[in-house]
C-alpha cells in the first residue's frame, strides 16, 4: 500500500480517537465529581495518547493529520447507557483498526 493510502487510513483512526476523547469527556463531565468521572477522564487521557501517536505517525509518513472528528455516541441519560455507548465505540474502533492493519499489511 502506498503512503497516501496508509495516511488516509491512519487519519480515519485519528478521527476516531478524537471522537473517543470528546465522548469520554462529555460522559465524565455529565457524571460530575467522583471516582467514576475521574476514571473516565483517565481513559480520555489514554485516548489522547493514541491520538498523539497516530498524528506523529501520519506526519512521519509525510501526511497531514486530519482535524475532523469521527462519529460519537453521546446519547442517553444514565451512566449505564453512557458506559454501554463507550464500550460500543471501543468495539467499533477495534474492528476498524483490525481492518486497517490487514489493509496496510497487504
What feature does the model see in each segment?
Residues 1-106:
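Non-heme di-metal
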